[in-house]
Structures are given as structure tokens and as C-alpha cells.
Amino acid sequence: MRLILLCVGRCKAGPETELSQRYIERANAAGRALGFPRVELREFDESRAREPALRKAAEAKTILASLSPGARLVALDESGALVSSREFSAFLGKTRDEGAPALTLAIGGADGLSGEILEAASPIVSFGRMTFPHQLVRIMAAEQLYRAMTILAGHPYHRD
């Protein structure tokens, strides 16, 4: 099953990009033997619309247009469910075992994700009730994908 990290906004070269890329590379190495051939990072520019609602609507169109047929959509949003790393890992394994061709994790831009995306997503996952910059959420998502691979593989990286 392909894993796609879909990000509104582009990260400039720097430590944030390097760290997220490092976790993606680790997830790729750990995931191949588990039926996750690679984590693909897709970025697109934030909308330039003046109103937040218009920006979110334009970004939602781009997100929905980029989904592969049959792909499962997970929205990362502060309103979502709080899940443990083990629960997230189990969800990835179950989704793979059900035969989904791809799983897309969507990270919104500065305004967050539109209601349309939140309605289309199942599940909506939160990294906490605080608001984080999308560059940091990208790192956190990449790390959680790597952590999920290690949990599925029985690797000691994750400790309860």
C-alpha cells in the first residue's frame, strides 16, 4: 500500500525539511518488507485567495483531485481523535490488509483543512489540542509513519 503525505505549503530547505526527509527515508527502508513500498511526499502551494474560507476551499479541490482511486484519506487536524502510536500502527496495518491501494495523510496550510476534507476523511487524527505549524506537523507525521513501521516489524524503536 502506498503511503502519501500530502502537504499544503512547501517547506524551504533547512532543518525541518531535512528531519522530515530523514524520517521518510527510515519509513521507506522499514516499510518495504511490510507491504509499504514507499512514503511519497507531495507538496503544493497554499492558495492566494484573500479570504480563509476561499483559501481552504481551493486547497480542498487540490487535495481531492490528487487522491488516487480507492485511496483512503486521513486528515490531520486538531479537532480529530487522539490516538496512540500503537493504535495508528494498527490502523495502517489493517488498512493495508483490507487491500487499500493507498493511504493519504493530509496536512492543511496556515488556515487548516476545509470542512469538505474533514467530511471526506476517515479518520481525522489529532496530534493534540494545541495548534502546530504545518512544517512541524509534517515532521511529526513522518516520524509517526516510521514509528508505525517499527511497531509492525517488532523493532524496539517504540517503547511503551
Curated annotation (Swiss-Prot):
Top-level EC class: transferase
Signal peptide region: none
MF terms (GO), sorted A to Z: rRNA (pseudouridine-N3-)-methyltransferase activity
GO cellular component, one term: cytoplasm
Main location as per UniProt: cytoplasm
Catalytic activity line of the entry: pseudouridine(1915) in 23S rRNA + S-adenosyl-L-methionine = N(3)-methylpseudouridine(1915) in 23S rRNA + S-adenosyl-L-homocysteine + H(+)
Matching InterPro entries: Alpha/beta_knot_MTases, RlmH-like, tRNA_m1G_MTases_N
EC numbers for this chain: 2.1.1.177
Keywords for this protein: Cytoplasm, Methyltransferase, rRNA processing, S-adenosyl-L-methionine, Transferase
Pfam family, any one: SPOUT_MTase
Binding site for S-adenosyl-L-methionine: 76, 108, 127-132
Subcellular localization(s) per the UniProt record: Cytoplasm
NCBIfam families assigned: PRK00103.2-3 (NF000989)
Functional note: Specifically methylates the pseudouridine at position 1915 (m3Psi1915) in 23S rRNA.
Family statement drawn from the similarity comment of this UniProt entry: Belongs to the RNA methyltransferase RlmH family.
Record note on quaternary structure: Homodimer.
Protein name according to UniProt: Ribosomal RNA large subunit methyltransferase H
Annotated organism of origin: Methylocella silvestris (strain DSM 15510 / CIP 108128 / LMG 27833 / NCIMB 13906 / BL2)
